[in-house]
From Swiss-Prot:
The lineage of its organism: Viruses, Duplodnaviria, Heunggongvirae, Peploviricota, Herviviricetes. The chain crosses the membrane at residues 17-37, 83-103, 118-138, 150-170, 208-228, 239-259, 270-290, 302-322. Residues 38-82, 139-149, 229-238, 291-301 are virion surface. The keyword Metal-binding does not apply. This is Envelope glycoprotein M. Residues 364-374 have a biased composition (Acidic residues). It is a multi-pass membrane protein.
Length: 374
């Protein structure tokens, strides 16, 4: 069936936003590579924020210069930037394949509004716009780190983290109720490319994005607490504990959000838990690398215990999610009634439920006559 003018307009907007996404991705890949060379306008190497060998956990911040607190060093920051852009590249391939699938599926549209519904199932124009903003904010973050503006960097990354959280939630829920999201997927014919994109490729991309969200939550906690530590006259050790405990609390909140809401849309959500496990390894590296500094400050054991609680909570949440996925398999899912009513054929004649004796009517007539005579 031919699509409506509204659906054609949404398709054109969606394809144009995809072109903007491709352009922004190219600039986002070029920027961190160019930022590694000082002669291209970047004053400092963004991966190395401060000299963490001068970390002193027993002192308070100094207003004259940047006080080093717990943050990622060059190898960890390089891993995060590389992994996030690899995921963005996979997302670009996903959207490109989805665009081809939607254009090819136009001739299979069963109704006037089917095309816009399929675009919503793949990723709405609003979702693409948020993806463009995500790439733009990560570019700003690299710029601000290169100029050592930690306050502006913390603010920019806060925006990036919030965009990433909202993007992931909208990506999973399709910005609709559970019933509507399920019905959107049911309208796609099974024998076309779009069906495989929505039902196979999209859940994989969701889990990959969730792993990136876990790493971005760690960067947000460290950036936010570094800005706090250089804004107030506090102990550096308090900032270290604050960053670790903040990263312990935020994933726990996400675990509850997953179990009570997001799992209804995507039961097999395991990417965030694996991302938290990788982030906890990244977080423990400074403790191992600067073991003497933490031991001298007498907070080595407390920091190690707090960091160890992060993967422990992630493993417990992962076990709960796996158990719920296994138990939900045994539940009977709702299925719609058949469109055509089924006819029932009886092979035997229907027997009456109550039987009456052949002479019962005679007795009734006699009783009525005697009553009348009296």
């Amino acid at each position: 069936m031919k699509s409506s003018k509204k659906d054609i307009f949404i398709l054109h907007i969606w394809l144009k936003l995809m072109g903007c996404y491709v352009f922004m991705f190219i600039t986002s890949v070029v920027l961190p590579i160019a930022a590694m060379f000082p002669n291209l306008g970047f004053p400092c190497y963004y991966n190395t924020l401060v000299d963490y060998s001068k970390l002193n956990l027993r002192e308070k911040n100094q207003a004259q210069h940047l006080t080093p607190t717990l943050f990622l060093e060059a190898p960890e920051m390089f891993f995060y930037v590389t992994y996030s852009f690899i995921v963005d590249c996979c997302s670009l391939v996903y959207y490109a394949l989805a665009a081809v699938a939607v254009v090819k599926a136009k001739k299979h549209a069963p109704g006037l509004m089917a095309l816009s519904q399929w675009i919503m199932a793949v990723g709405s124009p609003t979702l693409l716009y948020m993806a463009v903003l995500k790439l733009w904010t990560i570019q700003l973050y690299i710029h601000t780190l290169s100029y050592k503006h930690i306050y502006l960097a913390a603010f920019v990354y806060c925006l990036h983290w919030l965009l990433s959280m909202v993007y992931t939630e909208c990506y999973i829920t399709n910005v609709s109720s559970q019933w509507t999201s399920s019905e959107l997927k049911k309208t796609i014919p099974e024998n076309i490319l779009l069906y495989r994109v929505v039902h196979v490729l999209k859940p994989i991309m969701m889990n990959v994005h969730l792993s990136v969200v876990a790493l971005e939550t760690l960067i947000f906690c460290l950036s936010f607490m570094m800005a706090i530590g250089n804004s107030f006259y506090v102990m550096v050790s308090d900032i270290v504990f604050g960053a670790i405990n903040l990263y312990l609390i935020l994933p726990i909140i996400w675990y509850f959000v997953t179990e009570f809401w997001l799992s209804k849309y995507l039961p097999r959500q395991f990417g965030f838990y694996f991302g938290v496990l990788v982030a906890s390894i990244i977080l423990i590296l400074p403790v191992v690398r600067y073991d003497k500094i933490f031991v001298a400050a007498q907070i080595h054991r407390a920091v190690s215990i707090n960091i160890a609680m992060i993967p422990l909570c992630a493993l417990v949440a992962l076990l709960v999610r796996a158990c719920r996925v296994y138990t939900d398999r045994k539940k009977i899912a709702y299925t719609a009634l058949p469109s055509k009513p089924q006819t029932i054929k009886y092979t035997k004649p229907i027997e009456p439920s109550t039987k009456q004796a052949p002479d019962s009517s005679i007795f009734l007539e006699e009783e009525s006559d005697t009553d009348f005579e009296q």
